[in-house]
Amino acid sequence: MTVLKMTDLDLQGKRVLIREDLNVPVKDGVVSSDARILASLPTIRLALEKGAAVMVCSHLGRPTEGEFSAENSLKPVADYLSKALGRDVPLVADYLDGVDVKAGDVVLFENVRFNKGEKKNADELAQKYAALCDVFVMDAFGTAHRAEGSTHGVAKFAKVAAAGPLLAAELEALGKALGAPAQPMTAIVAGSKVSTKLDVLNSLSGICNQLIVGGGIANTFLAAAGHKVGKSLYEPDLLDTARAIAAKVSVPLPTDVVVAKEFAESATATVKLIADVADDDMILDIGPQTAAHFAELLKSSGTILWNGPVGVFEFDQFGEGTKTLAKAIGESQAFSIAGGGDTLAAIDKYGVAEQISYISTGGGAFLEFVEGKVLPAVEVLEQRAKA
């Protein structure tokens, strides 16, 4: 994958527009989870060190396009950046007709989705973005699967279009995990439905040695293998699909599970062998025997790709399976890459972030890359690099 990289460019005195993914949760006007902002800081700092006049842009939430809404304003993010960078980071609301930024200074543009034509990737808007800068830097992997004005359109028209360090690192890590993975490769794909992860499961079944499934997905595979799953969430119309995937790759199934009579924080957890699951049981986690077996598979892997917790880890009594696997991934010598919102929450809960080789900041983009789909915002950078 050949793209121009920001790290290789001379930015001294240049006007640099950086598209970051600063779409963070905000509560009562304050940023409540700062992971994405923290991930963007090295890129912003590097551009400043290189002597650029830095303009940062992002979306936040889902406002009605073309209309200002206070709840989707990037003001809390500007406040956070000011503290984190130890300098004033003004929020600029009107910037499309030009903005005055000096070399060595940084400003944050107001939510790009307040601009008409952003989501439709309108050329007229993209050209206005491009006219603001000498260099456009795409650093938002989390939005790379969307062709929008500030992710794709601007890259078509900017004088120079490059990948930022965060985007370049994501592409490198995913390329390493999927392109030529160290063997054996184990993937964990968990979630409520096979249907939403079908392309991921099909894609991974062609490259990994073991495919560990969890959550409602595992229940569908269990039912496909003839096991009773009680009143657990599963998809009866996808049993043949599950069997077809299991015929292509080793899918180790749980031998014991943690069940409850209801889906609730107060529910009583009971460990049962898979053969003992009753008609009124709900499977909400893998059992200790299964977790220990899966942990051994992970510890002896060369590459691990993790997407999704294997149980309802938000309730502690159904979190032991995910905790055991998270710790095993952390202890493994494998190159490990993890992505997806719930996965990141599990990594935080069990404190294994430092032990995972690469944590992807993109949810949808991570999955689409794993599926083998083209990411429009990356494709345009490749095209510009060739030109």
UniProtKB/Swiss-Prot annotation:
Record's keyword annotation contains Transferase: yes
GO terms (BP aspect): gluconeogenesis; glycolytic process
Residues annotated as binding ATP: K197, E314, G340, G341, D342, T343
Residues that hold substrate according to the record: D21, L22, N23, R36, H59, L60, G61, R62, R113, R146
Gene Ontology MF annotations: ADP binding; ATP binding; phosphoglycerate kinase activity
Source species, domain of life: Bacteria
InterPro entries tied to this protein: Phosphoglycerate_kinase, Phosphoglycerate_kinase_CS, Phosphoglycerate_kinase_N, Phosphoglycerate_kinase_sf
Location of the protein in the cell: Cytoplasm
Gene Ontology cellular-component terms listed: cytosol
One Pfam family it belongs to: PGK
Catalyzed reactions: (2R)-3-phosphoglycerate + ATP = (2R)-3-phospho-glyceroyl phosphate + ADP
Keyword terms, alphabetized: ATP-binding, Cytoplasm, Glycolysis, Kinase, Nucleotide-binding, Transferase
Pathways involved: Carbohydrate degradation; glycolysis; pyruvate from D-glyceraldehyde 3-phosphate: step 2/5
Chief location bin: cytoplasm
Enzyme Commission code: 2.7.2.3
Subunit structure, interactors included: Monomer.
PANTHER family, sorted: PHOSPHOGLYCERATE KINASE, PHOSPHOGLYCERATE KINASE 1, CHLOROPLASTIC-RELATED
Family: Belongs to the phosphoglycerate kinase family.
Protein known as: Phosphoglycerate kinase
Organism whose genome encodes this protein: Pseudomonas savastanoi pv. phaseolicola (strain 1448A / Race 6) (Pseudomonas syringae pv. phaseolicola (strain 1448A / Race 6))
